[in-house]
UniProtKB/Swiss-Prot annotation:
Name the record gives this protein: SAGA-associated factor 11 homolog
PANTHER family linked to this entry: ATAXIN-7-LIKE PROTEIN 3
GO BP field: chromatin organization; mRNA export from nucleus; positive regulation of DNA-templated transcription; protein transport; regulation of transcription by RNA polymerase II
Species per Swiss-Prot/TrEMBL record: Drosophila ananassae
Source taxon at top rank: Eukaryota
Length: 191
């Protein structure tokens, strides 16, 4: 019986390179009588290589403290269905919760649906507030121009700066008749 690499020690097989394995396999295939021996040799070599790789990897993971990572993350227990009143199947309350927000400006509780309009009015940032602010700026510019021309106090008071103070000096709206030359029809145009 000829001596084959499988009959030699398994230590030599582990150190054999892939080129040596291929060369040995080709020599064994040349003789049809030793074909069974060649298949056993190839199987044993591949099995030894795979087992040695697993051993080396497991040893490395144990030494580095990462062996628990090989097991993976433990799965939670199976999902439980909750069958209590006012709870959905996951155990979360289905009751409508009153959504109230606290205004950062006045510390009032305001319904969530009304929070944005409330905050807009509370901080003076709304459409009407911007009109009042632009009107206030226009009156300040007019009064400062009067102060420069007169050289003294124009008689203004602090009340003019207040948002809720109404001045008698406001311009009255022009009447419809003066705009249309007395005619409502055809916007005062004659044909």
């Amino acid at each position: 019986m000829p001596t084959t690499p499988s009959a030699q020690g398994s230590g030599n097989q582990n150190t054999a390179t892939s080129q040596q394995i291929v060369n040995n396999f080709r020599e064994l295939i040349k003789d049809p009588k030793s074909l069974d021996e060649a298949v056993n040799y190839m199987y044993q070599t591949l099995l030894d290589d795979a087992v040695a790789g697993i051993f080396i990897e497991t040893h490395h993971l144990r030494k580095t403290g990462n062996l628990s990572a090989l097991d993976g993350v433990a799965e939670d227990s199976t999902y439980r269905i909750c069958e209590m009143p006012n709870l959905d199947i996951f155990g979360i309350s289905t009751a409508k919760k009153p959504m109230d927000c606290t205004c950062p400006n006045c510390d009032r509780l305001v319904a969530a649906a009304r929070f944005a309009p409330h905050l807009e009015k509370c901080m003076g940032m709304g459409r009407i507030s911007s009109r009042i602010a632009s009107r206030r700026l226009a009156t300040k510019e007019g009064s400062s121009a009067a102060l420069l021309h007169s050289g003294g106090n124009a008689g203004g008071t602090d009340d003019e700066d207040d948002v809720d103070w109404s001045s008698d000096k406001r311009k009255k709206k022009s009447s419809q008749s003066s705009r249309n030359n007395g005619s409502k029809k055809n916007n005062g145009k004659t044909f």
